[in-house]
């Protein structure tokens, strides 16, 4: 932070806790952040709230002002809260540091009307995996029919002011959310009933629209941070800075820049830094540290102003050469008075910690950040979907070339999470029949791919079934011989299975299957058909036998199934054939196995 920054902590050994806001799209994350920011600007003196890159700092005195009687500032040593403004809804998974989450604590925003949605579950998975403590903001309480808003009031106060019916409706919605948390393995209750926040999740009813409950939200966040995280907040602000890249972007006049959160030490504008890149660590010199100009100066031509240094915890835009390969979610470390090779090794080690297991055969995955790549990879591993290549960045033609080398057609696919697909890559994928799946929600991305795999497998099964001789038993009907031989044309009833054309036919005698001929055609009322099912009566032509010699009216005949086909039907395709085909197969196998117990095994 610059010397003049009003949010500088008085106790420079305690940094501001970093807060991430997560939740399903449209559940009110952005509105909640905007309202916290807006309330802070209103409550603070002019200039008390500084604009930050990728973050909003709310100092303790401003929290105290918003929370009123709920907070006694003398109870707290921590300087305030730093809310990360994650780009897009999904980027919490970006925010990793030293193998865990960058955020010290999180707010999971859930719409009281909608409850848990796919991205809520996705957020919960990430919170579990990174072991990040969180509270639930049950948003949109003002939308309960009959709600009487009380702008900016603590939630218990405003709930007490509602009618019994409204209170009852709201409580029902809140307990549904508590139930859903329980289904996902978390014990939860209204925050004012929670005794131990380490064992239970506190639910804070809020309205981003009317600010009701926001005093409680800030109070609970401060209380949790102070009580459970004070030791973790102790840092040496004079030491070399450590941080995480939020976004890599082009900034006019500065070229490629990094939006970053510094969570330990200090970064200065003449420091040499090591940043995680696509091809490994990037070593570069800081040319400028940039902050947005204060709101009252926004009309000036330059959007940013330069500062000499930034101390943890804070957001900053870093301008430096050779940042083209830097990755969102990657570590940043200042070298300063440390051994260069040691710092490079630490960054390499941190990059290696990103748990993405690849195999020789599998799909290609692309994601916008290292953290999302890790989250997607972890989900695919749970679903037992193999990954051949995993990278950060847009889908390029070379990704298509890799995907098309997959041996299995189900693996000739690219799963793209929140990234662009270059036009020439899209054209090439179409040309080479590589399937592209794009989504901003991991669950939906994986679901689309699963549907694709199911469709391929079903088509393959159908193809196999087409080439397999299907089981059937049929009877020659009495008084239904239309032609005795060459070919014999008779009326039949299918007793079980499915009778098809161009199959060999056997009659069982003394435990032996004797081939009597080949069934050539099936007719239904003079029309040729491909098949007939159990219960149907048809006219069939059989090349080979003469009725009255090799076959008789009233005989039961069977389709001759090659032993190899019988084995495939029993062991691989049993679930894909109908119940009466299974019955016909079972009887056919039994007849053979009476003679040879290992037939078709």
UniProtKB/Swiss-Prot annotation:
Top-level taxon of origin = Archaea
Q: Using the UniProt annotation, give all residue ranges assigned to the region (G3).
A: 85-88
> Has the keyword Translocase been applied to this entry?
no
Sites where the protein binds GTP: 23-30, 85-89, 139-142
- Residue ranges for the region (G1) are 23-30
Task: Using the UniProt annotation, give all residue ranges assigned to the region (G4).
Answer: 139-142
Keyword list (alphabetical) reads: GTP-binding, Initiation factor, Nucleotide-binding, Protein biosynthesis
Q: What Gene3D superfamilies is this protein classified in?
A: P-loop containing nucleotide triphosphate hydrolases, Translation factors, Translation initiation factor IF- 2, domain 3
Q: Which PROSITE patterns match?
A: G_TR_2
Q: Where is this region: G2?
A: 48-52
GO molecular function terms listed in the Swiss-Prot or TrEMBL record: GTP binding; GTPase activity; translation initiation factor activity
The record's SUPFAM superfamilies line, in alphabetical order, gives: Initiation factor IF2/eIF5b, domain 3, P-loop containing nucleoside triphosphate hydrolases, Translation proteins
Query: Cellular component per GO?
Result: cytoplasm
Q: Where is the tr-type G domain?
A: 14-229
Q: Where is this region: G5?
A: 207-209
InterPro entries in the cross-refs: EFTU-type, P-loop_NTPase, Small_GTP-bd, T_Tr_GTP-bd_dom, TF_aIF-2_arc, TIF_IF2, TIF_IF2_dom3, TIF_IF2_dom3_sf
Instruction: Reply yes or no: does the keyword Nucleotide-binding apply.
Output: yes
Q: Please state which protein family the record places this protein in.
A: Belongs to the TRAFAC class translation factor GTPase superfamily. Classic translation factor GTPase family. IF-2 subfamily.
Q: What does this protein do?
A: Function in general translation initiation by promoting the binding of the formylmethionine-tRNA to ribosomes. Seems to function along with eIF-2.
Q: What is this protein called?
A: Probable translation initiation factor IF-2
| Natural source organism | Haloarcula marismortui (strain ATCC 43049 / DSM 3752 / JCM 8966 / VKM B-1809)
């Amino acid at each position: 932070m610059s010397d003049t920054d009003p949010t500088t902590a008085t106790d420079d050994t305690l940094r501001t806790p970093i807060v991430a806001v997560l939740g399903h799209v449209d559940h009110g994350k952005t509105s909640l952040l905007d309202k916290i920011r807006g309330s802070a600007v209103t409550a603070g003196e002019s200039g008390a709230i500084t604009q930050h890159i990728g973050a909003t700092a709310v100092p303790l005195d401003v929290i105290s002002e918003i929370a009123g009687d709920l907070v006694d500032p003398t109870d707290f040593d921590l300087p305030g809260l730093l809310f990360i403004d994650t780009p897009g809804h999904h980027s919490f998974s970006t925010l990793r540091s030293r193998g865990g989450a960058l955020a010290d604590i999180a707010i999971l925003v859930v719409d009281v009307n909608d409850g848990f949605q796919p991205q809520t579950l996705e957020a919960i998975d990430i919170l579990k995996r990174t072991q990040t403590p969180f509270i639930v903001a049950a948003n949109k309480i003002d939308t309960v029919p009959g709600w009487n808003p009380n702008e900016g009031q603590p939630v218990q106060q405003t709930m007490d002011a509602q009618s019994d019916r409204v209170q009852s409706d709201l409580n029902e919605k809140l307990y549904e959310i508590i139930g859903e948390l329980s289904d996902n393995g978390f014990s939860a209750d209204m925050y004012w009933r929670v005794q131990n926040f380490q064992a239970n999740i506190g639910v804070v009813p809020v309205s981003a629209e009317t600010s009701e409950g926001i005093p409680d939200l800030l109070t609970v966040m401060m209380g949790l941070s102070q009580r459970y995280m004070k030791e973790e907040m102790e840092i040496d602000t004079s030491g070399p800075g450590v941080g995480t890249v939020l976004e890599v972007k082009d900034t006019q006049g500065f070229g490629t820049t990094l939006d970053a959160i510094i969570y330990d030490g200090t970064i200065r504008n003449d420091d040499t830094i090591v940043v995680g890149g696509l091809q490994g660590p990037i070593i570069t010199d800081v040319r400028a540290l940039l902050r947005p100009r204060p709101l009252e100066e926004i009309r000036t031509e330059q959007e940013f102003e330069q500062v000499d240094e930034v101390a943890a915890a804070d957001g900053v835009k870093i301008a430096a050469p050779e940042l083209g390969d830097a990755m969102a979610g990657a570590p940043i470390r200042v070298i300063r008075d440390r051994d260069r090779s040691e710092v490079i090794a630490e960054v390499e080690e941190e990059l290696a910690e990103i748990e993405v297991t690849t195999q020789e055969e599998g799909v290609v995955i692309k994601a916008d950040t290292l953290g999302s790549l890790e989250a997607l990879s972890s989900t695919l591993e749970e679903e037992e979907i193999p990954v051949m290549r995993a990278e950060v960045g847009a889908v390029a033609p070379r990704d298509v070339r890799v995907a098309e080398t997959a041996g299995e057609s189900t693996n000739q696919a690219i799963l793209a999470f929140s990234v662009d697909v270059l036009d020439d890559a899209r054209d090439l994928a179409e040309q080479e029949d590589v399937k592209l799946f794009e989504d901003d929600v991991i669950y939906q991305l994986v679901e689309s791919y699963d549907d694709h795999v199911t469709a391929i497998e079903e088509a393959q099964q159908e193809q196999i079934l087409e080439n397999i001789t299907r089981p059937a038993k049929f009877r020659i009907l009495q008084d239904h011989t239309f032609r005795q031989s060459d070919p014999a044309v008779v009326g039949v009833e299918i007793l079980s299975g499915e009778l098809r054309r161009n199959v060999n036919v056997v009659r069982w005698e003394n435990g032996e299957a004797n081939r009597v001929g080949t069934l050539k055609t099936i007719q239904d009322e003079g029309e040729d058909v491909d098949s007939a099912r159990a219960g149907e009566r048809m006219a069939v032509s059989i090349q080979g036998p003469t009725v009255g010699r090799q076959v008789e009216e009233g005989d039961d005949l069977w389709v001759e199934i090659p032993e190899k086909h019988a084995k495939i039907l029993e062991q691989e395709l049993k679930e894909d054939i109908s119940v009466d085909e299974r019955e016909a197969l079972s009887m056919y196998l039994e007849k053979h196995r009476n003679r040879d117990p290992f037939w078709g095994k």
